[in-house]
């Protein structure tokens, strides 16, 4: 370990910054954020430094650096573009035993400034020891994306509750279970993010008053259409906190690989027209797992509220007062069309888009005359087995037989395949693809040849490319 990681309390501590340019500005912001009493020494200063000085946030000392400026200082940062000045600052600081950082000069540095993730009071520092600062920055960006913005508020809430928790729970195991429930409570987290103090207090009281074993919850998460990169950040956070993940066939292996390793996985195998596990039984699985005090993620392909029967599952939970929340996902229509180079709307082609299920209840009747209207795009989910009926009804109700159509198989994945042609060929085209597939009908499909980007790019280590076929 080349450097000992340490967090310094600089509130009202005297610190010196040598340099008055843009680099020094960035360092000054960090010192000011930490509450330090900052003195800045330089021959010239940027406008920002003058503004800070006028506001009384720091002091300016104009002129050449002199060792006397280090008197009674806790630390110094040298951020000039003059090597000799920076060397003098470092030498003087060493002689007076003052911690010194020389920007971009690891050999003349007694402390380094890491990349920082600030979720005060939670602070995360990342350093490469000056070896690879760009790598440290990239790591910080990845962690920034993973950590929710309300994390600091959650930590502050936990701090406020510590004494009460000690008094309320005598056993350490009960305290630990309480903290785990509180710190992973999705609805509480959302209330903190919304700054809804009333809801926050209600959730906290519910956690204190309900038996620990009864404090399960269900989070309905949309996994997106296939590409794991399309899973939302919040969705990723949820599947990595889950005790149990209930998932179906439309969730890709790549997404499942992101699930918390020790989480229980329950496969319910849903697909169009055939359910390995009936919907009523899925509802009961969610209910029973939550009643055991577990954090349950119901992971569904696409978006759970678009032909995903997510609403039906939540109704059951609501009937039994099980806490639940929803994390939307990118629906198949959006993902598959984008990865196929087919804009769902376009001023010259379509002013609206219709999302239609090809697997509705038996007594449901579609308004085919309305669907056959011009200037719109139709997207049929789970419509492969009904392709012949869709073709026949749309043509019968006035849609031109030459209307462009596309079928997208395994959309957004490395196995994506697109078959395109005309409406009059839809039944034939459907025989060339397998489920899961999406049917897109409308003149926007004609833009695919010009706008398709996915087929020309290699994906992953396999270098596989989208397969494209056209009939006609």
Curated annotation (Swiss-Prot):
Sorted UniProt keywords: Cobalamin biosynthesis, Lyase, Methyltransferase, Multifunctional enzyme, NAD, Oxidoreductase, Phosphoprotein, Porphyrin biosynthesis, S-adenosyl-L-methionine, Transferase
Pathway: Cofactor biosynthesis; adenosylcobalamin biosynthesis; precorrin-2 from uroporphyrinogen III: step 1/1; Cofactor biosynthesis; adenosylcobalamin biosynthesis; sirohydrochlorin from precorrin-2: step 1/1; Porphyrin-containing compound metabolism; siroheme biosynthesis; precorrin-2 from uroporphyrinogen III: step 1/1; Porphyrin-containing compound metabolism; siroheme biosynthesis; siroheme from sirohydrochlorin: step 1/1
Phosphoserine: modified positions: 128
Residues the record lists as binding NAD(+): 22-23, 43-44
Catalytic activity from the UniProt record: uroporphyrinogen III + 2 S-adenosyl-L-methionine = precorrin-2 + 2 S-adenosyl-L-homocysteine + H(+); precorrin-2 + NAD(+) = sirohydrochlorin + NADH + 2 H(+); siroheme + 2 H(+) = sirohydrochlorin + Fe(2+)
Region Uroporphyrinogen-III C-methyltransferase, annotated ranges: 216-472
Record-annotated active site: 248, 270
InterPro entries: 4pyrrol_Mease, 4pyrrol_Methylase_sf, 4pyrrole_Mease_sub1, 4pyrrole_Mease_sub2, CobA/CysG_C, NAD(P)-bd_dom_sf, Siro_Cobalamin_biosynth, Sirohaem_synt_dimer_dom_sf
The UniProt record lists the keyword Transferase: yes
GO BP terms: cobalamin biosynthetic process; methylation; siroheme biosynthetic process
CDD domains, per the entry: SUMT (cd11642)
GO molecular function: NAD binding; precorrin-2 dehydrogenase activity; sirohydrochlorin ferrochelatase activity; uroporphyrin-III C-methyltransferase activity
Binding site for S-adenosyl-L-methionine: 225, 301-303, 306, 331-332, 382, 411
Domain of life per record: Bacteria
Region of interest (Precorrin-2 dehydrogenase /sirohydrochlorin ferrochelatase), residue spans: 1-204
UniProt-listed Enzyme Commission number(s): 2.1.1.107, 1.3.1.76, 4.99.1.4
Functional summary from the UniProt entry: Then it catalyzes the NAD-dependent ring dehydrogenation of precorrin-2 to yield sirohydrochlorin. Finally, it catalyzes the ferrochelation of sirohydrochlorin to yield siroheme.
Family: In the N-terminal section; belongs to the precorrin-2 dehydrogenase / sirohydrochlorin ferrochelatase family.
Protein name as catalogued: Siroheme synthase 2
Name of the coding gene: cysG2
